């Protein structure tokens, strides 16, 4: 230490520093904590820059007894670094508030703080006297050691800087290491004590913690930090780099949160409804009834659960009979607390939401996202003034019309659009609709109507139910005729219990969904609701093809222009008349006044009311206040029928407009806005279903007609192909004569009539046409039966083949009666039927018509091979083989006119057919006409020479050999040699070796 720069310190009596000792070295302006190992900033001057006058002791020195004990316990050398340290439990408060005071520029008198520290009469020490008495000496010793460590580094900084520049840093001595270990030990003790203190504060009641936080905030305001920049830098580095700084900041944030929570808790307005939080998943309403039974009977306890799973969400609402009962319970559990299922419950009064339709959680989340201020206005969705579209709060321009947001753009939130500061629901003004909350699941409309009709007549009442379970959702809307009636009912029913189940009703004015910013202008609130109902009803009926019928105007209006002008004038005059009641609004579509609640149309000229359900006109009786039906409405139609045409025309010219309103299922049911919207959605869904069904029917009809037309065309083509085949391919026979049989015009007409039937016709028409077709076919067969038997057989085969597909496919009962074909038919029919079964060895018949028809159908080669080479199973069963050939040819062959089963000589086989086929031998199979032979010849090969470049290859063609060892079921394998057979003692390796040798031996033998 430089004695010329730092003089000898004074004793504790005067507690003053010499004039050369700057404020940056004053121990009273440094924190009593362990600083980091950094050194003072070399860029700062170490001269006496801040010349502040020394502090004065305003409250006097310590008592002599305290001073004597202090001098005996501590050496005089260390007393000059001593400063009043606060206990570690409140170090965070000290750092936090002293920093805030330094930023604001308020520096306090530290000598006053020191004297008040040891005076023992301040509020701070009195509130926590027990704790200070236990930890007084520890905190002082801890602060002395920590401050001495920092002071030593500050005083020896010149020497240490020189050592660093020379490159030889001086190591710490054992005393320094011992001092650091002792500091760490005290720090760990302080942290443990802080944890115990925090757990003790959590066990205390909220009111005590609130009072203690107030006293603590008063005490901590007496401390401040140093004004020197050097001391300030060290304090900041400690808070940012050390573990203790993070711990203090975290505890400070936790304490501030508890203070705000306690302030909100105690500042909440007491109410008869209490919210319980902290419930377990298995806690039920019965458990809450039991633990709260000592505070009297409870009106209702409801545990909030998930809508889908039914699991408890962890909180519940408890309704007390009165506010005093709820306050008594809250005061009692404030000190004792309640534990249920091993969890401590938290109670607080139920508070209403801040805005209409916005929950408290959403409000807090929005406020946190925009800075967290309690008094700030959270941005809300806004409505475009150009197109009336609702935009999100973050948008600066409308997403529909791209117009920028202006200051005049109204808020989409009704509660905020009416007031700039976001008023409560009750501050927006009364309405004639009340919302009733606090209902249970068993509530119904009759109960509410009985309760509210005592005070004022009810115009409409709607209990909101779940759309899937139809269970009450806990609230309802009551519509009165006037605001005065609604106000009267509100004052009489709010916070009252129902007579049936004792539920406490929470009644308030309802908010209209159509506020000032929605673009709907109407003279009153009821007109807004009625206009919305008409709009919803119009929307629903435009998709309903049954409900809203088009208006019918008289035919003379289109021809008579004057009549048109007169009708328009009547409508304008009717529109100019005033509405009979407040619920009626002008409907441009019908030309009448319409009441959405009753469903009546009002004619301003005649003063009559039209019921859209019954189609009758009524007059309103003011005395009885009832609707009286007009007389002679049913007889009007009969009289009109008996009148002559001139009278009918005259009456039709006098009629104005005939409307057909939407029918409602129940006359007594009142049509409200939500009902109209729901009806619109249902009508839209129904119309969509009908449209889908109509499209499906159209597709099915088109598909059916397409199939019918394809089938018709195929049958017609088959008939004409058969006719052409009969005239070109049929061989002449002595029994047939020169002229082949042809189909008559009557047969063709009956055939066309039979084939033109489709599935789209009705059953009656189909039956008639079937009978006509059958009659035509029978007449045809009768007319042709007089000719030769050969001609009749051929023609019957043609007709049966033509009519069998259509008539048999249409109905199994409709069949054509044909005489059976006997085996004794003439050979001509056999030749005709056999002419279509041409084998692959036959040369095709030369004919221009036949060449033009390509062979695209399936060819049964297996049947051809069986007929050519024979089969072991076909001997003695020629009838079956013949029928198989006919079936294969019926599916498709080179013959364009295949015969159906049983027609054209079925079961008749001759030996001439089999002998007409040419047997292909091995010599003929590979001859000059072979494709491979021709390819080799084109490449220069000739018979007798070998293959390859020099002709040394094979000369004979490869003969294919069939392998019958494993060809099909029942085949016997070649017997293996005895040396390759598997013996009982052979291993797997030996087995593989034997199989490989046997396979090699077999291949060698085959080659």
Swiss-Prot record:
Residues 928-974 form the G-patch domain. A zinc finger (RanBP2-type) spans 378-407. One of its GO terms (biological process) is regulation of RNA splicing. Residues 227-236 have a biased composition (Basic residues). Residues 40-49, 94-120, 138-185, 204-214, 237-264, 849-867 have a biased composition (Basic and acidic residues). Keywords: Metal-binding, mRNA processing, mRNA splicing, Nucleus, Repeat, RNA-binding, Spliceosome, Zinc, Zinc-finger. Residues 1-185, 204-269, 556-581, 631-656, 725-755, 771-797, 810-910, 945-977 are annotated as: Disordered. Ubiquitous with highest expression in siliques toward the end of seed maturation. PROSITE patterns: G_PATCH, RRM, ZF_RANBP2_1, ZF_RANBP2_2. One of its GO terms (molecular function) is zinc ion binding. It comes from the Eukaryota. Residues 778-793, 823-835 have a biased composition (Low complexity). Residues 272-352, 432-512 form the RRM domain. One of its GO terms (cellular component) is spliceosomal complex. It is found in: Nucleus. InterPro entries: G_patch_dom, Nucleotide-bd_a/b_plait_sf, OCRE, RBD_domain_sf, RRM_dom, SUA-like_OCRE, Znf_RanBP2, Znf_RanBP2_sf. Its main location: nucleus. Splicing factor that controls alternative splicing of the developmental regulator ABI3. Reduces splicing of a cryptic intron in ABI3, leading to a decreased in ABI3-beta transcript. Regulates the splicing of the receptor-like kinase SNC4/LRKL-2.6. Interacts with the pre-spliceosomal component U2AF65A. This is SUPPRESSOR OF ABI3-5. It comes from Arabidopsis thaliana (Mouse-ear cress).
């Amino acid at each position: 230490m430089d004695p010329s720069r730092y003089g000898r310190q004074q004793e504790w009596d005067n507690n003053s520093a010499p004039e050369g000792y700057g404020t940056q070295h004053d121990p009273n302006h440094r924190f009593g904590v362990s600083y980091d190992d950094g050194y003072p900033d070399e860029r700062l001057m170490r001269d006496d820059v801040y010349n502040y006058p020394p502090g004065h002791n305003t409250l006097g020195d310590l008592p002599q007894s305290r001073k004597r004990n202090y001098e005996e316990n501590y050496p005089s050398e260390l007393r000059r670094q001593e400063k009043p340290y606060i206990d570690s439990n409140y170090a965070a408060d000290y750092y936090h508030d002293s920093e805030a005071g330094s930023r604001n520029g308020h520096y306090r008198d530290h000598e006053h703080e020191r004297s008040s520290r040891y005076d023992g009469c301040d509020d701070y020490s009195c509130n926590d006297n027990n704790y200070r008495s236990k930890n007084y000496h520890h905190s002082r010793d801890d602060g002395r050691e920590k401050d001495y460590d920092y002071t030593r580094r500050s005083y020896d900084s010149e020497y240490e800087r020189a050592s660093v520049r020379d490159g030889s840093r001086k190591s710490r001595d054992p005393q320094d290491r011992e001092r650091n270990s002792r500091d760490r030990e005290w720090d760990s003790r302080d942290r443990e004590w802080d944890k115990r203190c925090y757990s003790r504060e959590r066990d205390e009641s909220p009111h005590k913690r609130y009072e203690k936080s107030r006293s603590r905030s008063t005490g901590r305001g007496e401390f401040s930090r140093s004004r020197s920049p050097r001391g300030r830098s060290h304090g900041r580095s400690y808070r940012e780099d050390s573990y203790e700084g993070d711990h203090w900041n975290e505890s400070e944030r936790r304490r501030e949160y508890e203070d705000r929570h306690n302030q909100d808790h105690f500042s909440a307005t007491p109410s008869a409804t209490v919210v319980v939080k902290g419930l377990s998943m298995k806690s039920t309403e019965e458990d809450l009834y039991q633990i709260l039974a000592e505070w009297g009977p409870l009106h209702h306890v409801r545990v909030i659960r998930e809508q889908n799973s039914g699991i408890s969400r962890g909180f519940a609402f408890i309704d007390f009979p009165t506010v005093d009962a709820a306050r008594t319970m809250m005061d009692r559990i404030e000190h004792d607390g309640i534990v249920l299922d091993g969890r401590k419950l938290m109670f607080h009064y139920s508070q209403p939401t801040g805005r209409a339709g916005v929950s408290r959680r959403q409000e807090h989340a929005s406020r946190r996202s925009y800075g967290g201020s309690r008094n700030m206005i959270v941005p809300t969705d806004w409505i475009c003034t150009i197109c009336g579209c609702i935009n999100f709060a973050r948008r600066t321009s409308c997403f529909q019309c791209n117009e920028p947001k202006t200051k005049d753009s109204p808020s989409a939130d009704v509660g905020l659009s009416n007031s700039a500061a976001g008023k409560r629901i009750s501050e927006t003004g009364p309405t004639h609709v009340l919302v009733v909350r606090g209902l249970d699941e068993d509530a119904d409309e009759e109960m509410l109507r009985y309760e509210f009709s005592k005070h004022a007549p009810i115009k409409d009442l709607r209990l909101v139910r779940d759309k899937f379970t139809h269970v009450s959702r806990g609230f309802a809307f009551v519509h009165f005729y006037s605001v005065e009636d609604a106000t009267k009912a509100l004052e009489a029913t709010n916070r009252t219990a129902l007579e049936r189940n004792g539920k406490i009703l929470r009644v308030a004015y309802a908010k209209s969904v159509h506020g000032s910013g929605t673009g709907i202008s109407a003279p009153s609130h009821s007109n807004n609701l009625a206009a919305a109902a008409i709009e919803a009803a119009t929307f629903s009926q435009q998709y309903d093809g049954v409900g809203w019928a088009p208006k019918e105007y008289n035919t003379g209006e289109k021809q008579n222009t004057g009549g048109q002008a007169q009708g328009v004038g009547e409508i304008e005059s009717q529109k100019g008349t005033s509405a009979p009641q407040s619920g009626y609004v002008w409907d441009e579509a019908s030309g009448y006044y319409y009441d959405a609640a009753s469903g009546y149309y009002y004619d301003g000229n005649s003063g009559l009311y039209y019921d859209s359900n019954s189609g009758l006109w009524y007059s309103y009786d003011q005395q009885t206040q009832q609707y009286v039906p007009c007389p002679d409405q049913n007889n009007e139609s009969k009289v009109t029928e008996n009148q002559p045409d001139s009278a009918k025309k005259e009456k039709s010219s006098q009629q104005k407009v005939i409307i057909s309103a939407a029918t409602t299922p129940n006359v007594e049911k009142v049509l409200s806005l939500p009902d109209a919207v729901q009806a619109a959605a249902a009508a839209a869904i129904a119309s969509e279903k009908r449209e889908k069904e109509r499209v499906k029917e159209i597709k099915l009809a088109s598909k059916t007609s397409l199939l019918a037309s394809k089938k018709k065309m195929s049958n017609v083509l088959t008939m004409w192909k058969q006719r052409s085949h009969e005239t070109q391919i049929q061989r002449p026979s002595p029994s047939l004569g020169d002229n082949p049989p042809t189909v008559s015009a009557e047969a063709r007409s009956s055939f066309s009539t039979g084939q033109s039937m489709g599935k789209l016709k009705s059953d009656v028409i189909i039956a008639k046409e079937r009978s006509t077709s059958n009659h035509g076919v029978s007449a045809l067969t009768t007319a042709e039966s007089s000719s030769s038997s050969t001609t009749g057989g051929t023609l019957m085969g043609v007709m049966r083949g033509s009519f069998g597909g259509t008539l048999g496919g249409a109905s199994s009962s409709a069949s054509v009666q044909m005489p059976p074909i006997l085996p004794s038919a003439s050979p001509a029919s056999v030749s005709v039927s056999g002419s279509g079964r041409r084998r692959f060895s036959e040369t095709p018949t030369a004919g221009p018509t036949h060449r033009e028809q390509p062979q695209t159908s399936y060819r049964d080669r297996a049947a051809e091979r069986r007929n050519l080479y024979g089969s072991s199973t076909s001997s003695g069963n020629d009838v079956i083989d013949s029928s198989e050939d006919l079936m294969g040819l019926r599916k498709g062959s080179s013959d364009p006119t295949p015969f159906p089963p049983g027609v054209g000589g079925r079961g008749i086989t001759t030996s001439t057919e089999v002998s007409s086929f040419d047997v292909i031998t091995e010599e003929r199979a590979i001859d000059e006409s072979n494709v491979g032979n021709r390819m080799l010849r084109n490449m220069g090969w000739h018979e007798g020479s070998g293959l390859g470049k020099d002709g040394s290859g094979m000369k004979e063609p490869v003969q294919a050999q069939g392998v019958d060892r494993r060809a099909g079921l029942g085949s016997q394998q070649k017997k293996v040699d005895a040396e390759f057979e598997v013996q009982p003692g052979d291993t797997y390796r030996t087995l593989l070796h034997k199989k490989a040798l046997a396979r090699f031996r077999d291949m060698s033998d085959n080659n």
